[in-house]
């Protein structure tokens, strides 16, 4: 079973409450506003700030383009 992208309509970044985008290649949910990437493990998003990694400036620009 794969991550259900329909979840993106109802979940939000726990830090900024903004929209999330799914990065299928890295299995992460991206919040450009908070500059964080949340892992998706076994198709379950881990929306904990301490589990997220910080996005680089290049990554933020890539997702905002």
Swiss-Prot record:
CC per GO annotation: cytosol
Coiled-coil segments on the chain, per record: none
Pfam family, one: Trm112p
InterPro entries associated with the record: Trm112-like (IPR005651)
Matches recorded under PANTHER family: PROTEIN PREY, MITOCHONDRIAL, ZGC:162634
Family: Belongs to the UPF0434 family.
Protein name in UniProt: UPF0434 protein PSHAa1659
Lineage of source species: Bacteria, Pseudomonadati, Pseudomonadota, Gammaproteobacteria, Alteromonadales
């Amino acid at each position: 079973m794969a991550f259900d992208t329909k979840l993106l309509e109802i979940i939000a970044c726990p830090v900024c409450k903004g929209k999330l985008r799914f990065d299928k290649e890295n299995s992460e949910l991206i919040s450009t506003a908070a500059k964080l990437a949340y892992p998706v493990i076994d198709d379950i998003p881990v929306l904990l700030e301490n589990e997220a990694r910080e996005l680089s400036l290049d990554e933020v620009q890539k997702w905002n383009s």
